Structure formats: C-alpha cells, structure tokens
Amino acid sequence: MQDNNQKSIASAILIVGILIAGAILLKNGNVNSPAVNKPISKTIGLNVKSFNTCLASGKFKDKIQTDIDSGVLAGVNGTPSSFILKDGKVVGIIPGAQPLEQITKQIEDILKNEKTPLTTELRPVSSDDHILGNIDAKIIIVEYSDLECPFCKVFHNTMHQVVEKNNPNVAWVFRHYPIPQLHPKAFHEAEATECAWEQGGNKVFWKYMDKLFEVTPSNNGLEESML
C-alpha cells in the first residue's frame, strides 16, 4: 500500500506539474531575463576569490546529492515538485508551477481543515535546510528545484509571493534537484548557491539564488563565468 501511495504521489507531481507549468509558460511566453554584465558573486558583494575557490573545490557536491537522493525517495521525478507540511506531516502536494491563487486556496484549506497525512518518505525539515520565512510557521512548503528549469524560474517568483502573502503562517524550504539530462549546468549552479551560503549564511544563499533565477534565461542559458 505504501509503495502504491508513493507512486501515486510521484505520478501526480509529474503529470499535473507538466500540464500546469506548460500552460503558464504558454500564457506568459518566454521568461525574460536582464542582460548579465558581471558575475552574480560580484553583483551581490561576495568575496569573489573565495567564492571561485569554493566553487572549484566541489566541496558541496555531497550536500546537493543528499538533496537529490531525498527527493527521489520522496517520489520526485520532475521540477518544481513541492510538498506541503503541517505539524511536520505531508498533507498536500504542489505539482509543478501552480499559480499563486491556487496555492493560496490550498493553504487556506489546510489551515481550516484537518487533512489525512500522505504516505511519502520526505526527509524531515532540519537546521541543514535553507528556510525562508517564519521557522515556526504552521505550514512549511518543501520545494525541490532545478536552477535551469524555466518552470522553476516562474515558480520561484510565485513562492516569494506565497510567503509574503501568508506570513507568518507559511515558510519555504528549498532543496536542490538538478536534472543533468535536461540541464547539465544546474548542478554546478547549485554548488554556487552553497558557496554563497558559506560566505553569508542563509540570507546570502537566498540572495544569490534570487539573482541567479532573475538573470538566467533557463535551459542552460547562463554562462559559468557569470556565476
């Protein structure tokens, strides 16, 4: 029964996610990105030399792989894939890049009504995670994302709105899920966000990632020299 439930969750995330995300991009067209004329690390004020040393070292490969492995165990097989937690238990999923209005309805429903927890092997949220928002929020949304995924780029902006609109009831956890078959640059970019974290903690991690999503054209369009 547990395996069947996990497969159902994974299928829902993949199929519905593709349909919704595709519809959003068809409606909005290509996601525009500003011209990049200097590395993100320099733009946000990092020590560029230390950043580049970190990035070349590969020291965060295991950390990113741990995120990927946890996503696979939870049933993730596409991005973005998100799980809604209440009291530490998974009570809903957000398949793909759903719009703000739909996510808000889900949140309101979960806050008002008791939900039967879903059967999934999602790794519990811990201090090792990158969290945005109130750490004591009633609801935590755990997202698995690929930094070169165009759907993830759209959803990243949506999730910022979700946290802002529902503060202090909702927090956002970001976990890496680069898909090398589609976006071979995404894993290295994930390492870059962790190197930013190394210099400035959680706040700088989010600042770097926000800028990366802002400037990347997606689908491997960001040059490595601009990290």
PLM regions: where:
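Cysteine-centric redox/oxidoreductase cores and disulfide-bonded domains
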Residues: 3, 7-15, 19-79, 83-116, ...
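Gly/Gly-Pro-rich "capping" loops immediately C-terminal to redox-active cysteine motifs
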Residues: 48, 97, 163, 167-170
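A generic local structural motif
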Residues: 68-69, 126-130, 158-159
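Extracellular/periplasmic catalytic domains that process cell-envelope and extracellular macromolecules
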Residues: 73-78, 133-137, 165-167, 185
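Short coil-to-helix leader/linker segments, especially the first N-terminal amphipathic alpha-helix
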Residues: 115-124
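A short beta-strand-turn-helix
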Residues: 123-139
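Short active-site neighborhood of thiol/selenol oxidoreductases, capturing the structured segment around
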Residues: 134-149, 172-176
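Typically the conserved alpha-helix immediately C-terminal to a functionally engaged Cys/Sec
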Residues: 145, 151-167, 178
